[in-house]
């Protein structure tokens, strides 16, 4: 039996080439596959089959000089690994796991000569990345993301605040104030507002600076650690000042700060790189935010390959 043929539809196919092209265009938008299917009057299976016709090909003969590593939550309890070209923002790879074995097996596909071209890798403070990066890329410099360093210190300050707050009577104004206005302690003191607000907890109009002063007056230990915490800022990016401050105070601070300081000293070379080099994970974090938007629009992905 003869089969009619036309340039509009491939042989033995029922979906026109134009429709498939339109599906491909919409697949790069932040739209669920079910919405694409409904818009073009095709089945969701057709959209999925069209998606699978595209393959993410890896060029094993190229790696950029500057890379960014990070992870994101693919689904509850499962972290995936993402690599991005720092300069072009092109995604180089998305791996379903962030284990050392998975990362090593992926990058060992690249010849050593290609891997030797990599000069800088930015990453967060996930220590398993350090070892694997040094083994795979012998000439690279590891640059810790400055935001994660600040966040690490900030979380320690928050734990100290909670520890001191829990020593107060939970019915007292001191406890309620410390719990309600905790963000003022975490905030950069130079950015506190001078505007007056009526605060029910204190039953008066106060500025943020005045509220902060009240909170610090409840505990001398809290005040001392807050003042130290405020000295750790990267606006001036002075590595010598940063580490001399740690060395001068490590023996007389709360054990929570001591643990943090020891980690920072251990990662001193990577933190110095973060302060001296113009690289960070900011661009990759923007990509991760886009991934979160896609996941939210599609209510998640069950199949990693489809993602």
Predicted regions and their residues:
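RNase H-like nuclease fold core
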Residues: 46-120, 125-132
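Alpha-helix capping and helix-loop boundary segments enriched in small/acidic/polar residues
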Residues: 10-14, 94, 98, 144
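Short, positively charged, Gly/Tyr-enriched micro-motifs
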Residues: 1-67, 72-78, 115-118, 271-272
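Active-site catalytic pocket residues across diverse enzymes, especially alpha/beta-hydrolases
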Residues: 55, 137, 157
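Short, surface-exposed amphipathic charged segments that create phosphate/polyanion-binding patches used
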Residues: 155-166
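Acidic/histidine-rich catalytic cores and adjacent linkers
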Residues: 51, 76-77, 81, 95-96, ...
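Short, polar/flexible loop-turn hinges at active-site or ligand-entry regions and domain interfaces
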Residues: 7-12, 140, 164-169
């Amino acid at each position: 039996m003869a089969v009619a043929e036309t340039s509009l539809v491939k042989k033995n196919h029922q979906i026109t080439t134009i429709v498939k092209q339109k599906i491909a265009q919409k697949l790069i938008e932040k739209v669920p596959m079910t919405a694409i299917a409904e818009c073009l009057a095709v089945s969701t299976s057709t959209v999925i089959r069209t998606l699978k016709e595209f393959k993410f090909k890896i060029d094993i003969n190229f790696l950029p000089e500057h890379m960014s590593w990070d992870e994101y939550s693919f689904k509850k309890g499962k972290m995936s690994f993402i690599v991005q070209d720092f300069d072009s923002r092109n995604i180089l790879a998305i791996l379903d796991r962030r284990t050392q074995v998975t990362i090593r097996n992926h990058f060992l596909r690249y010849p050593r000569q290609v891997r030797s071209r990599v000069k800088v890798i930015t990453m967060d403070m996930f220590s398993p990345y350090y070892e694997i990066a040094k083994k795979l890329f012998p000439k690279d410099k590891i640059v810790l993301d400055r935001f994660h360093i600040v966040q690490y210190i900030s979380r320690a300050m928050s734990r100290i605040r909670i520890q001191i707050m829990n020593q107060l009577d939970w019915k007292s104004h001191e406890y309620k104030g410390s719990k309600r206005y905790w963000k003022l302690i975490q905030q950069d003191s130079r950015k506190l507002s001078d505007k007056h607000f009526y605060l029910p907890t204190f039953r008066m109009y106060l500025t943020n600076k005045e509220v902060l002063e009240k909170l610090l007056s409840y505990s001398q230990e809290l005040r001392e650690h807050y003042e130290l915490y405020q000295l750790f800022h990267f606006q001036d990016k002075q590595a010598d000042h940063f580490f001399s401050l740690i060395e001068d105070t490590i023996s007389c601070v709360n054990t929570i700060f001591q643990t943090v300081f020891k980690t920072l000293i251990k990662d001193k070379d990577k933190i110095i790189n973060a302060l001296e080099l113009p690289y960070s994970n900011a661009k990759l974090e923007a990509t991760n935010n886009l991934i979160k938007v896609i996941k939210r629009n599609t209510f998640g992905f069950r199949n990693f390959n489809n993602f």
